[in-house]
Amino acid sequence: MTTAHILGFPRIGAQRELKFALERYWRDGASADAERALVDTGRALRAEHWRIERDAGLDCVTVGDFAWYDHVLTTLAHVGGLPRRFGFDAHALTLADYFAAARGNAAQPAMEMTKWFDTNYHYLVPEYSPATTFGPGVEWLFDEVREARALGHRAKAALVGPLTLLWLGKARDGLVERLALLPRLVPAYRALLARLREAGVDWVQIDEPIFSLDLPDAWRDAARPTYEALAPGAPKLLVATYFDDASEHAALLKALPVAGLHIDLVRADAQLDAFVADYPADKVLSCGIVDGRNVWRNDLDRSLARLAPVRDALGERLWVATSCSLLHVPVDLAHEPRLDEELKTWLAFAAQKTREVAALRDALVKGRAAVAAEFDDAAAAAAARRTSARIHNPLVKRRVAALTDADARRASTYSVRAAAQRARFGLPLLPTTTIGSFPQTPEIRRARAAFKQGVLDHLGYLEAMREQVRIAIDKQLAYGLDVLVHGEAERNDMVEYFGELLWGFAITSNGWVQSYGSRCVKPPLVYGDVYLPEPMTVGWASYAQSLSAKPVKGMLTGPVTMLQWSFVRDDQPRATTALQIALALRQETLDLEKAGIGMIQIDEPALREGLPLKARERAAYLDWAVRAFGIAASGVADDTQIHTHMCYSEFGDILPSIAALDADVISIETTRSNMELLDAFETFDYPNEIGPGVYDIHSPRVPDADEIERLILLALERIPAQRLWVNPDCGLKTREWRQVDAALAAMVDAAKRVRQKVEEAVPA
C-alpha cells in the first residue's frame, strides 16, 4: 500500500514548551531537578507529536527529528563527533556538555552557527581537523525508538546523512579535505544503523540535502561507496533530498544500494520525470508534494493529478510526503483563535499538513470519493483565495510598474556622500555603535502583555516603552558609544513589528518556528499587496534623538529579509512582493529623514540566505534583491547615512552584489569565525565602510577588552581604519543587561585603545 509519512515534525511544541523548558534549565544552572524537568518536557512533546502523526493517518511516525538544540549537533553527538577542543567523552556526553558546545562555556567559545541551506533555521557548524575521530555516541535516538514503540507506534528513524554532515562542517587545523574523514565516519554510521535494526526499526530516513546542490565530482563519487558500506546490516534506507532540484544526480541516486529515495516536488516539480523514468523496481519513491516550508493550504486536486501518473507507474512503491521536515512551519492552526477566518481557510500548519499527506494517500489508494469532503473544502479555499479582493491593491501595482532604474540608485557616488556625512557627523576614527536591539527585559514583556490583555491602555504602554528608550540612551551615553540606537523596546520581533503595521501582512498568535536553540520567531504572513498606510518608526526614532546630541540611527528591516522571514504568498513572483515591500520602506526612510534622523539602518541579515542553491539561478535573485534594497534606500540625501546589517553569512561569492547595495556602512557577523569572513576582503576591494562584529551576542559569555582589541586589530589587517566601524555581531535583544553593560564597556575601551594606537602610528 502507498505509504504516507513526513520527514520531520516541529520540535518546539505548540506553545513553545521546549523553549521555556530550555530556558528554565539554563536559568537554574543545569541542576539535577532542572534536567529532569527538561527531559520530561522532551518526552511529553515527542509523545504529543507522534500522536498528531498517528491521528492524522500517517503510516509511521518519525523519530530522530527531535533535538534539544539542533539536529546537526545531535547527529554529531550520535556519532561521537563533537569538537575535540571541548574535551568531552563522546560516549558519556551529558546534556550540560551538549549545551556547552552549542552555547560556549568559560573555557571555550560556542560552535559557529550558520543558516541551514536557504532557510531561516540555524545549525551548529561541525569542526573537523586531522585529529577528528568518530565512534559510539549518546543513546538518545535509541531512547526515542523505545518511547515510540512503547506507545504502539511504527517508527521510522531520521538522521542527517554522512555526506551532508561532512559537507556542512569546516576544516580546521590543517585539514585539507573534509572527505578525508569519510573512512572514519562511515563505520560510526554503520554501527548506529546496525543498532537501529536490532532495535526493530524497519526504515531509516537518511537526509542528504546536499544532492540538491551543484556538487563537486569528488562528493558525487563518494556517494556510492558510502552507501555500499552502510546498506549491509542496516534497516531499509530512504535517502532524502530536498530544498531544490536533484535531477542532475538522478542516475547516481537511483543506482545507490538503498531501498528508496525522497525528492522535493514543491521546490522542484520538474525533477519528477527524471526520477520516474527507469525507476528501479527495488526502490520506493517518496514524493514531497505537501510544502514543508510555507503555510498555504495544499491544492489537493492539483497534487492528486500530479501524483496519479506516478502511482500508475510505481504502484505501491509511491510514497506521499511533505517536501522537507515540517520544522520550518508552525505547529497547529488550531491555536489561532484570533486569526481572520477567511485567511485561516487558506492555511495549513504542521498538524494540518500531516492530514493533507494522509488524504492524498487515501485518494490515491481508495479514490477521490473516499475523501471528497476534504478535497472539496480545499478546492473551495483555493478558489476563494484566487479571487479575493483583499489580496489585490491597484495603487500598489501601479507604483511597482512605474519604478525606474534611477529609483534604485543613490543620487551621488559613495565618495561624495562620505564627504557630506563626515562633515555632518564628525565621528572619530573607528566609530562605535550597536546593531539595534537591546535586552527585552521582564519589564518590557510585562508591559507588552498588559497592553495586549487590555490591562494597560495605549498611553500607558507608550510611556512604558519611552522609559525603556530613555534607559537605553542613558546606558549608551555611559558606555561612550559614538552612534546610538533607541533599543527597539517596542518591537517583539524585527519582522513581525513591521508586519503588524503594513497592509497585506497578517500576524499569528502562536505561529512560532524555531530559529536556533530556544530562539523562536513568529513569521508574519504576506497574503496580499503590501502598502504603508502611515509612518511606522518615526515617533520612536525622533524621541530617542531628542535625548542626545549624538546621532541616533533609525532602524528598519530590509525588503529581502522581510520576505525571507515571512511566509510569503505563492501567487506572484517573490521579486514582485519584494518591490512592494521596498516601496513601503522607501516612504519610511523619507519620513525618517524629514524628521531629522540622519542615519538609517536597513537590515538585510537574510540576503545571503535567500540565495538560490543552484548557481544558475543566483544572478537573477541577486539582481532583484539588490534592486529592492536600492528602492528602499535611495530616496534620501547625500548626507543621510544608510547602514545595513547582515549575519550568519559566507560573503565571498556575493561580495560584488553586497557592494552593489551601496550602503554607506555595512555591519557583519564575524566573531565566531574569528574574522575569517573578512578573508574575502583581501581579494575584493570593498569600497564603503564596514563594521565586522567583535562581540558574539549569541553566547552568554562576555568578552574582555583584550579579546575585542585582538579582533579589531585582525580586522585592521584587511579594512583601512578610515572605513572600519566597531560593533557587536548582531542585536542584543536576547542578552541580559548585566552582560551587555560589561561587553559594550569593554568594546568601547578596546576601540579607544586601538584608535590611540592607529593615531600614534600616523606621522604628524
Swiss-Prot record:
Binding positions for 5-methyltetrahydropteroyltri-L-glutamate per the UniProt entry: R16, E17, L18, K19, K115, R519, C520, W565, E609
Pathway(s) the chain acts in: Amino-acid biosynthesis; L-methionine biosynthesis via de novo pathway; L-methionine from L-homocysteine (MetE route): step 1/1
UniProt EC number: 2.1.1.14
Top-level division of the source organism's lineage: Bacteria
Cofactor: Zn(2+)
Ligand binding (L-methionine): I435, G436, S437, E488, D603
Gene Ontology biological process terms, A to Z: methionine biosynthetic process; methylation
Keywords: Amino-acid biosynthesis, Metal-binding, Methionine biosynthesis, Methyltransferase, Repeat, Transferase, Zinc
Chain residues that bind L-homocysteine: I435, G436, S437, E488, D603
Catalysed reaction, written as an equation: 5-methyltetrahydropteroyltri-L-glutamate + L-homocysteine = tetrahydropteroyltri-L-glutamate + L-methionine
InterPro entries reported in the protein's UniProt record: Cbl-indep_Met_Synth_N, Cobalamin-indep_Met_synthase, Met_Synth_C/arc, UROD/MetE-like_sf
Cofactor binding annotation: Binds 1 zinc ion per subunit.
One Pfam assignment: Meth_synt_2
Keyword Heme: no
Keyword RNA-binding: no
Catalytic-site annotation from UniProt: H698 (proton donor)
Binding site for Zn(2+): H645, C647, E669, C730
Any GO molecular function: 5-methyltetrahydropteroyltriglutamate-homocysteine S-methyltransferase activity
Role according to the record: Catalyzes the transfer of a methyl group from 5-methyltetrahydrofolate to homocysteine resulting in methionine formation.
Protein family according to the UniProt entry: Belongs to the vitamin-B12 independent methionine synthase family.
Protein name as annotated: 5-methyltetrahydropteroyltriglutamate--homocysteine methyltransferase
